[in-house]
């Protein structure tokens, strides 16, 4: 009953928000199965909520009005973060039973006009929201989206530009604090976007921790072997070699050498074997 959430989002996911033809009495399911598309009724659900808010306002039920407004405020805040635009606001087109997104400097646009990346992310968020919302409707209080659960997302980076890859996992884990997210990815920007996570290489059968300590370049070129090792590491290794060969170092140079030595000693052999080998030489 929304108390434990399970969901799976495949790599080839396509966001489809069913457009309302009018007001519908949307009933959220007690339980959604793992692959069921709960998010596709988002717009219908929002129209239903606005209608209920209007009825409550007419009846003088301020508590319901405020609770529903809190829901919209929180969803709007999520859009502002995900779309990286603080001017984002939801606009209800009551004549056409639809919602549009208003952004400073452009005409209001529909959810269907979002790019594949933004659409995909908002779809995941809305799907999980609707899986949990049964709770607060029953308890007559605003949901904190703190239900426990396990969510699988295949190739999380699909359609996402770099900045969105960096923020998506931190956003999901903050918005849904009790959900365990298990994701597959080839993106270094996702791998180092969060500190309290473990990574497992399915090819090498290696478990890695705290990849947030490494730059995206180090992960991309060192771990993913896009190059023998990263350009940054190359420069640092050359600098370290230069400092090691120097005889009369300043206090600042000795401190820099010690700092680099500690960094290279802590490099995982699985993360950047070539760089470590170079250091040991």
Predicted regions and their residues:
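Acidic, Mg2+-coordinating catalytic modules of nucleic-acid enzymes
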Residues: 166, 208-281
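Switch/communication elements of ASCE P-loop NTPase nucleotide-binding domains
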Residues: 97-229
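Hydrophobic, Leu/Ile/Phe/Ala-enriched alpha-helical segments that form helix-helix packing faces
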Residues: 1, 75-86, 128, 132, ...
